[in-house]
Amino acid sequence: XNYVPEAQKLFQAHN
C-alpha cells in the first residue's frame, strides 16, 4: 500500500 502519513495528517485536519 501506499501508506502516506502526510495524507493521513491532512485527513485528520479535514475531519
UniProtKB/Swiss-Prot annotation:
Chief location of this protein within or outside the cell: mitochondrion
Name assigned to this protein: Cytochrome c oxidase subunit 7A, mitochondrial
Similarity remark: Belongs to the cytochrome c oxidase VIIa family.
Function recorded in the entry: Component of the cytochrome c oxidase, the last enzyme in the mitochondrial electron transport chain which drives oxidative phosphorylation. The respiratory chain contains 3 multisubunit complexes succinate dehydrogenase (complex II, CII), ubiquinol-cytochrome c oxidoreductase (cytochrome b-c1 complex, complex III, CIII) and cytochrome c oxidase (complex IV, CIV), that cooperate to transfer electrons derived from NADH and succinate to molecular oxygen, creating an electrochemical gradient over the inner membrane that drives transmembrane transport and the ATP synthase.
Higher taxonomy: Eukaryota, Metazoa, Chordata, Craniata, Vertebrata
GO aspect biological process, one term: oxidative phosphorylation
Description of how the protein assembles with itself and partners: Component of the cytochrome c oxidase (complex IV, CIV), a multisubunit enzyme composed of 14 subunits. The complex is composed of a catalytic core of 3 subunits MT-CO1, MT-CO2 and MT-CO3, encoded in the mitochondrial DNA, and 11 supernumerary subunits COX4I, COX5A, COX5B, COX6A, COX6B, COX6C, COX7A, COX7B, COX7C, COX8 and NDUFA4, which are encoded in the nuclear genome.
Modified residues (Blocked amino end (Xaa)): 1
